[in-house]
């Protein structure tokens, strides 16, 4: 069974949809880095049937967190290669403090095949806090929770773990200590 998106793309390509139903002057795509093969096929079908349609795709290839379900920033990159396309880098960050942004910039320089090339600049006054902690032991949770408790009044924190199991254990401990937490995990 095809998804609704794949079926719509197929119907448009085969001329099974009335032109007035798909005739658009502007198409805005938010979170374009999260497009998968089906969404891209639908976009291509709409573009092919609306030659004058203006496409505005907004996305951040560094924030593609849905690869596990088939999204690929390459589809957004392909749009930048279209004839007449214009690529605009938005480099000002109003959400994060200086240290996290600089840390992320350092990490992102090591990634191949990025669309953006200009480093991000924090526009906030706060310096922020970044700490990389590596533990060789399976008993890493308590020291990490204690460190987060020390910084809990200084803003939002993020913890990256190697496995989903580690993330679940850590979240339970944080909640036990009264720290509101949210689990974001892959489906692996």
Segments predicted by a language model, with ranges:
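Conserved interdomain hinge at the start of the Helicase C-terminal
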Residues: 133-154
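A short acidic, often aromatic-flanked loop/helix-cap motif at beta-alpha or helix-coil junctions
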Residues: 93-97, 137-142, 187-188
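Conserved RecA-like helicase ATPase core segment
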Residues: 38-129, 134
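Generic beta-sheet signal
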Residues: 25-27, 55, 153-161
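Short, surface-exposed connector motifs at secondary-structure boundaries
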Residues: 24, 84-86, 147-156
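Accessory N-terminal region flanking or inserted into the helicase ATPase core
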Residues: 1-31, 37-42, 57, 67, ...
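Core RecA-like ATPase module of SF1/SF2 helicases and allied nucleic-acid translocases
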Residues: 98, 158-188
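A short acidic, amphipathic alpha-helical/loop segment
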Residues: 39-46, 147, 169-173
């Amino acid at each position: 069974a095809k998804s609704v998106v794949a079926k719509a793309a197929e119907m448009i390509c085969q001329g099974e949809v009335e032109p007035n139903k798909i005739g658009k002057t502007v198409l805005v795509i938010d979170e374009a880095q999260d497009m998968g093969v089906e969404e891209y096929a639908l976009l291509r079908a709409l573009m092919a049937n609306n030659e004058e349609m203006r496409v505005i795709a907004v996305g951040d290839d560094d924030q593609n967190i849905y690869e596990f379900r088939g999204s690929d920033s390459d589809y957004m990159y392909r749009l930048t290669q279209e004839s007449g396309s214009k690529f605009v880098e938005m480099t000002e960050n109003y959400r994060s403090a200086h240290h996290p942004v600089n840390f992320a910039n350092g990490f992102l320089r090591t990634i191949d095949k990025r669309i953006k090339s200009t480093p991000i600049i924090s526009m906030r006054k706060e310096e922020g806090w970044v700490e990389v902690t590596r533990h060789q032991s399976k008993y890493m949770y308590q020291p990490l929770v204690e460190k987060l408790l020390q910084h809990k009044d200084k803003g939002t924190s993020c913890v990256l773990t190697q496995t989903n199991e580690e993330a679940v254990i850590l979240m339970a401990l944080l909640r036990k200590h009264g720290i509101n937490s949210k689990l974001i995990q892959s489906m692996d």
